[in-house]
């Protein structure tokens, strides 16, 4: 999300509803805290508001709410609906001859929802080359291994069958992601799906590859420990 909001997307926190802004839809709405942190850092609302996550009468609900949170382009949570809305936004842009782009992030477990594939068929049929979808492919969902719940595999072949351009990357490598997004922007024949191979809980040893952390917050002690982790990145030209 940081790469999208700080490098790729045409957005203005001072004018969050600008007609020609790029749109972002977090189809895996349960990952809302990551979106909220990005929006706060970008300046859509004060960072102090992050401390009110999921509190009554505050703007940051458990899932993105476009009516209460500045910068949220679509309310999501019911899996599959976000990518469907993103398709509608992309088609509207085509009809209006607008040059904005639409980005959406899905979870791999979310791909078990049939609505996702209706949306994929729709986007491929209408050649929505202004739409880029990302799949967070870590192989885990709240109930465990995705292949043992309701396997959506093979993912690349499914998107290709609906006339999507498919790019696979290491989801923890910003350079690979940046290059993939630039490739998607240059592709004119239809939508692009960027499959990000990731590790759940990457960087935190006791969380890595553990499905149990899907919907569980760290304890106060664990939160303090996490705050001390420093991840350095080399300076990039973009």
Would you name each region that the model predicts?
Residues 22-24, 100-104, 131, 190-198:
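Generic beta-sheet signal
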Residues 196-207:
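SF2 helicase motor core recognition
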Residues 42, 149, 208-212:
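Short secondary-structure boundary/capping segments
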Residues 229-238:
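Single conserved hydrophobic/aromatic residue that forms the stacking wall/gate
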Residues 71, 75-78, 83-187:
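Thiamine diphosphate
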Residues 139-142, 207-216:
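Short beta-alpha connecting loops at secondary-structure transitions
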Residues 1-125:
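Cofactor-binding active-site loop characterized by glycine-rich and histidine/acidic residues
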Residues 213-225:
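Gly/Ser/Thr-rich active-site loops/lids in small-molecule metabolic enzymes
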């Amino acid at each position: 999300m940081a790469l999208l909001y700080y490098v790729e997307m045409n957005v203005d926190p001072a004018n969050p509803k600008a007609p020609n802004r790029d749109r972002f839809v977090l189809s895996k709405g349960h990952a809302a805290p990551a979106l909220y942190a990005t929006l706060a850092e970008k300046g859509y609302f004060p960072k102090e508001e992050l401390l009110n996550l999921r509190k009554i009468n505050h703007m940051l609900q458990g899932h993105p709410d476009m009516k209460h949170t500045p910068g949220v382009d679509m309310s999501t949570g019911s899996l599959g609906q976000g990518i469907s809305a993103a398709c509608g936004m992309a088609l509207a842009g085509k009809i209006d001859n607008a040059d904005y782009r639409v980005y959406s992030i899905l979870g791999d477990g979310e791909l078990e929802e049939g609505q996702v594939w209706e949306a994929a068929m729709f986007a491929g049929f209408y050649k929505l080359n202004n739409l880029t979808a990302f799949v967070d492919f870590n192989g885990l969902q709240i109930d465990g291994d995705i292949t043992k719940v309701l396997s959506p595999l093979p993912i690349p072949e499914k998107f290709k069958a609906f006339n999507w351009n498919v790019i696979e990357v290491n989801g923890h490598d910003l350079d690979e992601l940046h290059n993939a997004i630039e490739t998607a922007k240059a592709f004119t024949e239809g939508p692009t799906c960027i499959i990000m191979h990731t590790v759940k809980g990457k960087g935190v040893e006791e969380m890595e590859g553990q499905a149990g952390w899907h919907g569980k917050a760290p304890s106060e002690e664990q939160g303090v420990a996490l705050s001390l982790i420093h991840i350095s990145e080399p300076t990039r030209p973009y």
